[in-house]
Curated annotation (Swiss-Prot):
Name of the protein in question: Succinyl-diaminopimelate desuccinylase
Entry-linked CDD domains: M20_DapE_proteobac (cd03891)
Gene: dapE
Enzyme Commission number: 3.5.1.18
Oxidoreductase as UniProt keyword: no
Cofactor note (record): Binds 2 Zn(2+) or Co(2+) ions per subunit.
Enzyme class: hydrolase
Length: 392
């Protein structure tokens, strides 16, 4: 398992589109057992519904515990591929397949790093055996690309009950925009999605006094939402952003006033806000658009997590130093991009993210350079050595 490409190909060959596992965790579990890990499979799901499989693995006993988290589920392949999306082919020096970058390749690199750490020299003979005093844990879910209800957050709850703890955690998401060594994620913005339905009364456009047009209030609400800047950013976060995503009336007739109109928008917010504070902010503007009438609208809010930050320090320094030693580049520390399961882990232990290049993730012909698989494996190995020599 010291070769990341072999394991990455085996994982990519599993069509594990959320919530299907398709054998991916079996492949990973076999590799980890061979390295001395104790593995526990943790299927979770709603009563009577489909269950999602997860894996927790640990090697070692007392002492500091280094955690690694990731996911084996992938988004649907879609169309436009030049190679089979689950063929796991190597083409022009790159592994092509859904999940190669996001993030089966990263998982394979971490397993290869552990194998090299504990099993002796690499092909160049430059790595000496280093069986750490302490432990290594992996938290791998099959529910990250989907609703994320029965994955990492449920495994963390199980860990608390079982007395399993990590001293820190590295999430292997593809954090690098263009090249390996670009970026370490030390936090993420929060996310809040709102669906507002403005209620009115249908009627003929020639007789507006007999109807109540909700589109006019929707227009007012849109203006209120966009009229002010949420903030100007903070030391580690860019400014919060509100983006309209949908206006739906369901009215094909130009001479009919609709009975309702629905607006959807998302706010990606920094650490100056919380889901609770922004929910109140949205509700106040809905009330204002409806002249204080609570019966004039319905509001559904989906809060996937607040902004969080692991301040620059021992964990990010450990990753950056290892990356610079391998690539010659010291990564930028960033909180940009979308959400990840790090939002759940942050309440368990310090967490940071670093993985492969994400330029092609979720796209046709998703790919990762074979050379990057090798380089990331060496970065992860150096991170492990650094941690066990001087735990963060």
């Amino acid at each position: 398992m010291a070769d990341p490409l072999a394991l990455a190909r085996a994982l990519v060959a599993c069509p594990s589109v959320t919530p299907r596992d398709a054998g991916a965790l079996d492949v990973l579990e076999s590799a980890l057992i061979a390295l001395g890990f104790r593995c526990v499979r943790l299927p979770f799901g709603a009563e009577g519904g489909e269950r999602v499989d997860n894996l927790y693995a640990r090697r070692g006993g007392a002492g500091p515990c280094f955690g690694f988290a990731g996911h084996t589920d992938v988004v649907p392949a879609g169309d436009g591929w030049s190679r089979p999306p689950f063929g796991a082919e190597v083409v022009d020096g790159a592994l092509v397949g859904r999940g190669a970058a996001d993030m089966k390749g990263g998982i394979a690199c971490f397993v290869a790093a552990v194998a090299r750490l504990i099993s002796g020299p690499d092909s160049t003979g430059s790595i000496s055996r280093h069986d750490p005093t302490g432990s290594i844990a992996l938290l791998i879910t099959g529910d990250e690309e989907g609703p994320a209800l029965h994955g990492t957050r449920k495994v963390l709850e199980w860990m608390e009950g079982a007395g399993e703890r990590m001293d820190l955690c590295l999430v292997g998401e593809p954090t690098n925009p263009e090249g390996l060594g670009d970026m370490i994620k030390i936090g993420r913005r929060g996310s809040l999605t709102a669906t507002v339905t403005l209620l009115g009364r249908a009627g003929h456009v020639a007789y507006p006094h007999l109807a109540d047009n909700p589109l006019h209030r929707l227009s007012t609400l849109t203006g209120l939402l966009l009229a002010e800047t949420l903030d100007d950013g903070t030391a580690h976060f860019q400014p919060s952003s509100l983006q309209l995503t949908s206006i739906d009336v369901g009215n094909p007739a130009a001479n009919v006033i609709p009975a309702k109109a629905t607006l959807r928008f998302n706010i990606r917010f920094n650490d100056r806000h919380s889901g609770e504070s922004l929910s109140a902010w949205i509700r106040a503007r809905c009330l204002a658009a409806c002249d204080g009438d609570e019966s004039g609208f319905s509001l559904v809010l989906e809060h996937s997590g607040d902004a969080f930050l692991t301040p620059p320090g021992p964990l990010s320094d450990l990753i950056a130093t290892a990356c610079q030693a391998v690539t010659g580049r010291r990564p930028e520390l960033s909180t940009s991009g979308g959400t990840s399961d790090a939002r759940f882990i942050r309440s368990h232990c310090p967490v940071a993210e670093f993985g492969l290049v994400g330029r092609t993730m979720h796209k046709p012909d998703e790919r990762v350079a074979v050379a990057d698989l090798e380089a990331l494996s060496e970065i992860y190995r150096r991170v492990l050595v650094g941690f066990f020599e001087a735990p963060c």
